């Protein structure tokens, strides 16, 4: 009967140390012995009398009718569940299969009600857009101004992220900016950021160009580019008064002038046939702004004019030449008169003279030759004239033209190329440390930028 009984894993192993050993000596099979449990009582009493030990904990779910444990047998007789009426081997298998599942359920600390997990560095506030109807992301009501301002501040700190983040930004605006008031507010935010933060003028102009071509909204009156030019027109009409104003007014006016120059270079207008042109109104506006700056020849006005011409001079002159206009000649003439007559500082006069030299050199542009043909021994008779001459161990000179020494010549030439940057005395000929460079002084524009940088650094330290 015991041969056909399947013992559950682990059951009876602990009892084999005491009672199971004596049953083996008595000729009985260790472990469960079928339905007879009375024969184990003498052995149990003898083991308890010879050695006092803590009774073993009964299993949570023991097999019914087991003769090894009287307490477990008594408990099993009291149960009335259907499992108690199953065969012994079936119930034992059920116990052995249920134990790993119970153990895993007790050790697990996972919960379906746990809070949502976010990786480190993930910002929930920066991703507060939600999808609506599977189309464009939408912002919660009343947060458009904060969203746009945060994005502008982010571009100011990280202008390199423009290409990656401007597309989702325009998607949000396409779904949120639906009225003339919200569009006007968007234009004003970008304009104020461009003239209040000097380093944002270029990025702001790029952003204006992108939005003017990709902001697909249909307001009742005007689009983004029209409202932007209208806002610039309002500031443009104050040019003479601003050029004569105090230092703060002139500083704001100069920021507007440079932003308008960036707009002229970056704002693209697509024609009816798909051609891309620049805004003509900005071209004429820059000419008027230069006249206002030269009409009030104080140092900061003249320096602003120099910066504007360095930025847009070559493009303006090319555009005026296409129309057969001599506007750049008039600008240069006014600049020379300022150098001769105005009571500006010596550094500013030096900046103006250098700008005249820059324009005389075609604004520093170098046009490559239209045709280029690589020199070879067949098409260039002077091909071997600039090649070095080597000598054999016998003192016989040879060059690349000698066919008997071509292999040896190439080997020596490669060795010379390996030490190309070193002179005969062992020093590095290409190292600027050994060169006498007297032109290490900063020009006035660089000095001004450096002073501004130092002042901004001190201001940030005090905050």
UniProtKB/Swiss-Prot annotation:
Record carries keyword Cytoplasm: yes
GO biological process terms on file: regulation of translational initiation
Compartments reported by the entry: Cytoplasm
Stated role: Acts as a coactivator in the regulation of translation initiation of poly(A)-containing mRNAs.
Pfam families linked to this entry: MIF4G
Keywords associated with the record: Cytoplasm, Translation regulation
Domain MIF4G: residue ranges: 145-362
Entry protein name: Polyadenylate-binding protein-interacting protein 1
Stretches for region Disordered: 1-86, 420-442
UniProt keyword Metal-binding, yes or no: no
Bias (Acidic residues) ranges: 433-442
Quaternary assembly: Interacts with the RRM1-RRM2 and C-terminal regions of epabp.
GO molecular function: RNA binding; translation activator activity
Annotated Gene Ontology cellular component terms: cytoplasm
InterPro entries, alphabetized: ARM-type_fold (IPR016024), MIF4G-like_typ-3 (IPR003890), mRNA_TranslReg/HistoneTransl (IPR051367)
């Amino acid at each position: 009967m015991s041969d056909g009984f399947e013992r559950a894993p682990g059951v009876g192993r602990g009892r084999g140390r005491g009672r199971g050993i004596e049953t083996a000596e008595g000729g009985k099979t260790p472990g469960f012995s079928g339905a007879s449990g009375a024969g184990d009582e003498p052995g149990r009493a003898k083991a308890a009398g010879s050695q006092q030990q803590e009774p073993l904990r009964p299993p949570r779910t023991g097999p019914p009718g087991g003769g090894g444990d009287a307490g477990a047998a008594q408990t099993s007789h009291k149960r009335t569940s259907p499992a108690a009426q199953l065969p012994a081997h079936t119930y034992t298998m059920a116990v052995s299969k249920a134990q790993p599942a119970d153990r895993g359920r007790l050790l697990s600390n996972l919960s379906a009600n746990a809070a949502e997990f976010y990786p480190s560095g993930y910002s929930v506030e920066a991703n507060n857009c939600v999808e609506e109807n599977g189309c464009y992301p939408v912002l919660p009501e009343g947060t458009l101004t904060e969203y746009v301002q945060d994005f502008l501040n982010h571009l100011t700190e990280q202008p390199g992220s423009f290409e990656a983040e401007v597309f989702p930004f325009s998607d949000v605006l396409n779904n949120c900016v639906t009225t003339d008031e919200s569009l006007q507010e968007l234009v004003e935010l970008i304009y104020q950021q461009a003239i209040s933060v000097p380093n944002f003028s270029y990025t702001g102009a790029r952003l204006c160009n992108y939005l003017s071509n990709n902001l697909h909204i249909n307001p009742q009156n005007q689009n983004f580019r029209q409202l932007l030019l209208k806002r610039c027109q309002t500031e443009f009409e104050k040019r003479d008064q601003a050029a004569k104003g105090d230092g703060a007014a002139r500083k704001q006016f100069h920021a507007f002038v440079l932003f308008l120059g960036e707009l002229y270079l970056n704002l693209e207008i697509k024609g009816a046939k798909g051609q891309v042109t620049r805004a003509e109104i900005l071209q004429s506006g820059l000419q008027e702004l230069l006249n206002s700056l030269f009409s009030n020849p104080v140092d900061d006005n003249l320096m602003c004019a120099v910066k504007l011409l360095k930025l847009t001079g070559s493009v303006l002159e090319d555009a005026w030449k296409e129309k057969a206009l001599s506007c750049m000649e008039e600008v240069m003439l006014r600049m020379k008169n300022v150098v001769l007559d105005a009571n500006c500082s010596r550094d500013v006069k030096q900046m103006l003279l250098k700008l005249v030299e820059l324009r005389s050199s075609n604004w520093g542009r170098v046009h490559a030759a239209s045709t280029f043909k690589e020199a070879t021994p067949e098409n260039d008779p002077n091909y071997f004239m600039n090649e070095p001459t080597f000598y054999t161990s016998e003192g016989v000179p040879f060059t690349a033209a000698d066919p008997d020494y071509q292999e040896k010549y190439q080997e020596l030439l490669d060795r010379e190329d390996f030490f190309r940057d070193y002179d005969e005395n062992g020093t590095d000929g290409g190292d600027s440390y050994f060169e006498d460079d007297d032109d290490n002084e900063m020009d006035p524009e660089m000095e001004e930028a450096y002073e501004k940088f130092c002042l901004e650094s001190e201001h940030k330290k005090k905050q």
